[in-house]
Amino acid sequence: MTSIIKLTTLSGVQEESALCYLLQVDEFRFLLDCGWDEHFSMDIIDSLRKHVHQIDAVLLSHPDPLHLGALPYAVGKLGLNCAIYATIPVYKMGQMFMYDLYQSRHNTEDFTLFTLDDVDAAFDKIQQLKFSQIVNLKGKGHGLSITPLPAGHMIGGTIWKIVKDGEEEIVYAVDFNHKREIHLNGCSLEMLSRPSLLITDSFNATYVQPRRKQRDEQLLTNVLETLRGDGNVLIAVDTAGRVLELAQLLDQIWRTKDAGLGVYSLALLNNVSYNVVEFSKSQVEWMSDKLMRCFEDKRNNPFQFRHLSLCHGLSDLARVPSPKVVLASQPDLECGFSRDLFIQWCQDPKNSIILTYRTTPGTLARFLIDNPSEKITEIELRKRVKLEGKELEEYLEKEKLKKEAAKKLEQSKEADIDSSDESDIEEDIDQPSAHKTKHDLMMKGEGSRKGSFFKQAKKSYPMFPAPEERIKWDEYGEIIKPEDFLVPELQATEEEKSKLESGLTNGDEPMDQDLSDVPTKCISTTESIEIKARVTYIDYEGRSDGDSIKKIINQMKPRQLIIVHGPPEASQDLAECCRAFGGKDIKVYMPKLHETVDATSETHIYQVRLKDSLVSSLQFCKAKDAELAWIDGVLDMRVSKVDTGVILEEGELKDDGEDSEMQVEAPSDSSVIAQQKAMKSLFGDDEKETGEESEIIPTLEPLPPHEVPGHQSVFMNEPRLSDFKQVLLREGIQAEFVGGVLVCNNQVAVRRTETGRIGLEGCLCQDFYRIRDLLYEQYAIV
């Protein structure tokens, strides 16, 4: 049976913002990606909030924030609680993306939208899959299966194939790349022929991409000229996606002696650079065949870089000799080390800035790409500095009050410690810094308590109310206090002290440093900066070009196409091209923001609610794996809010023109108006008020018995004559084919007519009626 398929666009249509879409297949709802843009627009969150409790599963296609950036917020703040599916690299690298993004923001501003704990909680819900692994969903998703296929854009990047009962095939393919690269193979399209629905993006639909060789030569020339001119090169990259391709390319160039770059430095700078490289080493099986062969034949891990230095902060980078090439995150230049280096290096004409990614319009990197002639720009300078003077005194006073309150609470707990024996066991361990280490071994005299596994019924305490530290025991002996074994912290070096004085601690230290020990605040100023360095955009996005996208869609030949994520001009161009290729065989949709697209294959399918009295009166006939029944009922337009419905095919639903609840002008047109109202309520705008989480579905009520009209029998599940022959033989009836006609006991002939219907011929005898009954049993008759 054909399924009801709808797509609601929450973000990422007719524009280049983050991707987030709600796909409904019958009663099951998928969230396709959960991205957030570089500016953390709350419009995306507001759209997601309306549907968050309807979502049954989340499918993540890529590990970058544009595809999963809003996931920690949705789980931590909106209460998203459902299965989340992603490949293993998307799970691991997605964490690296979000860790680096959080730390990059936290280093220069008071970032409170989500925390690292929210990131961990969100990624703990992810079910990790391998490519081509078929997952059959359960519960509301019974009959649905999902399969991740390689997209070729980033490591673990996925094209999702969703199949309903082996019939409806939905393909979600955004940001794919068919070309083979150094570290990734191209996308796999062999398993994606003739899908029922293709959801794809138009980001590159009108983009003419230079050849890879030309781009590599441009990059090498730019780097050589800058380094030989005693300048530094900043390459703005992402955290753990496309940076792997550039790191492989540059490390290979550095290994080539003819290039003459061995005397210069190459560095990777982000908050999680070490973890990114280590994860890459363990995921070689997800990469290109070339890297796999290199690893298997030479036993040499391709991510064991010879020339690439890993840096976690500006202090690490300062130890790398200049001139140097630095791969720094973030690609949008809105935050992170790339922004810090851009501000430092852009005013020196010797330096070069290379942008590798077209980020969302409105970001600094996109401004530089779209306006290459602009040499003066206003930039907000953000940094975190330590508190001084009155602010520091106020902060210390607040901390002192907090500590005093905590100390009083602790003393009150210790005063009540002798209320019961059990409270002595269950009391929490004191704060690490609350007590001073006294000795290594337990002294028997202390606390007047013996060291044994058995508690004494009677305790003795000092006569005077002097608080005394009590030694706590459990089944294994004395409870260990971690503070007794701590090594005293070393004095800060002069270098670290100077960094604290200059207020650069947050930006210069690795991510794992506890910044809460130093009282700080964030300040920002806006300055006009003259860009004297050379700024170049070289495409290393890893996406298919416009012509290739159109050829791929034409090769797949989808019956329906929904175009998302791209500027309006590119979406229109791709739609016109696909209509020209497919003609009437393809339906193309270009939804607007918050619009719901009805992509149901059969248009005469309605979703209604059945009354219990009607369901109990139905007589079902089994046909293969389904049960069918004929329904005569009245469509009640007084709608009821429900979450699910029953799907009825055209011909099985009868509207009563005399329904008193329907306000119509003429009774003869009542059924037409009822259908129009039903279609409006069923396939209209799903965007209701915030509190209306469920769809509004009309109710089908039973007709009075005296008004039920008769109908001709409908024969379904038509058998094949070869199968019917086996049935006759099992019943002891001789049957054989003679000229395509099944002859039974030499008295009855069963043949298929030119119209495809089965006819029964012969004399009216006992065998004729017996064979007719056996033939009827092969059908589902309603």
UniProtKB/Swiss-Prot annotation:
Residues 417-430 have a biased composition (Acidic residues). Pfam families: Beta-Casp, CPSF100_C, Lactamase_B_6, RMMBL. The modification Phosphoserine is found at residues 419-420, 423, 660. GO terms for cellular component: glutamatergic synapse; membrane; mRNA cleavage and polyadenylation specificity factor complex; nucleoplasm; postsynapse. Gene3D superfamilies: Ribonuclease Z/Hydroxyacylglutathione hydrolase-like. It is found in: Nucleus. Its main location: nucleus. Residues 407-449 are annotated as: Disordered. GO terms for molecular function: RNA binding. Keywords: mRNA processing, Nucleus, Phosphoprotein, RNA-binding. GO terms for biological process: mRNA 3'-end processing by stem-loop binding and cleavage. Residues 407-416, 439-449 have a biased composition (Basic and acidic residues). The keyword Hydrolase does not apply. Belongs to the metallo-beta-lactamase superfamily. RNA-metabolizing metallo-beta-lactamase-like family. CPSF2/YSH1 subfamily. PANTHER family: CLEAVAGE AND POLYADENYLATION SPECIFICITY FACTOR SUBUNIT 2 (PTHR45922:SF1). Component of the cleavage and polyadenylation specificity factor (CPSF) complex that play a key role in pre-mRNA 3'-end formation, recognizing the AAUAAA signal sequence and interacting with poly(A) polymerase and other factors to bring about cleavage and poly(A) addition. Involved in the histone 3' end pre-mRNA processing. Component of the cleavage and polyadenylation specificity factor (CPSF) complex, composed of CPSF1, CPSF2, CPSF3, CPSF4 and FIP1L1. Interacts with CPSF3, CSTF2 and SYMPK. Interacts with ZC3H3. This is Cleavage and polyadenylation specificity factor subunit 2. It comes from Homo sapiens.
